[in-house]
């Protein structure tokens, strides 16, 4: 994981607010599962970005917690006058293999293409999902809930490699 900053309680408040701003219209509206796809795809990419040890995704994930903490500190202080709190318990999703990294790359391309085709509102939801995924997955609780994700990516990459190399086909 390429994240030097732990999420603070005020950073969590910002992530929770962004999550609620994206979830509430769906809850109050039709509750169609397909309406969650923009936020969910962004969240998934943000979550896997925390597993990246470098590159653009790793850098963006590393910056997200710091941005959330800074914005949360200012927001909470402006609204309540109270000072911020210490860092929350850190979590780690695990490691990517080279095969898993290929799956993350393909996933990034897919989300980027969806971003290019999306309308303004869906782009906001995708960005919010990415931010929430990158910030919440550095906490111990969310990382524990999603600890299956890197293994799934690595396995999918290994299966892709085996299929391309001809192992186990027919």
Q: PLM features: what roles do these ranges have?
A:
Residues 139-170:
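Alpha-helical transmembrane segments of multi-pass integral membrane proteins
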Residues 24-49, 119-131:
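Alpha-helical transmembrane segments and their helix-start/interface "positive-inside/aromatic belt" motifs
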Residues 1-14, 92-104:
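Structural signature of hydrophobic alpha-helical transmembrane segments
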Residues 41-62, 131-147:
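Hydrophobic alpha-helical membrane-insertion segments
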Residues 56-75, 145-156:
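Interfacial/capping segments of alpha-helical transmembrane domains
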Residues 106-114, 130-133:
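Hydrophobic, membrane-inserted alpha-helices
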Residues 81-108, 167-170:
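Hydrophobic alpha-helical transmembrane segments
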Residues 8-29:
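N-terminal signal-anchor/start-transfer transmembrane helix
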């Amino acid at each position: 994981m390429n994240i030097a900053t732990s999420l603070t309680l005020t950073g969590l408040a910002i992530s929770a607010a962004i999550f609620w701003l994206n979830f509430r219209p769906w809850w109050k509206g039709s509750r169609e599962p397909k309406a969650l796809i923009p936020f969910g795809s962004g969240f998934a990419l943000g979550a896997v970005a925390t597993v990246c040890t470098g590159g653009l995704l790793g850098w963006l994930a590393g910056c997200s917690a710091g941005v959330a903490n800074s914005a949360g500190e200012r927001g909470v202080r402006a609204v309540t006058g109270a000072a911020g709190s210490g860092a929350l318990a850190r979590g780690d999703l695990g490691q990517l293999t080279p095969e898993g990294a290929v799956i993350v790359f393909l996933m990034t391309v897919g989300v980027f293409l969806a971003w290019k085709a999306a309308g303004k509102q869906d782009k906001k939801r995708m960005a919010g999902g990415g931010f929430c995924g990158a910030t919440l997955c550095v906490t111990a609780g969310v990382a524990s809930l999603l600890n299956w994700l890197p293994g799934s990516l690595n396995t999918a990459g290994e299966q892709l490699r085996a299929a391309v190399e001809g192992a186990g086909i027919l």
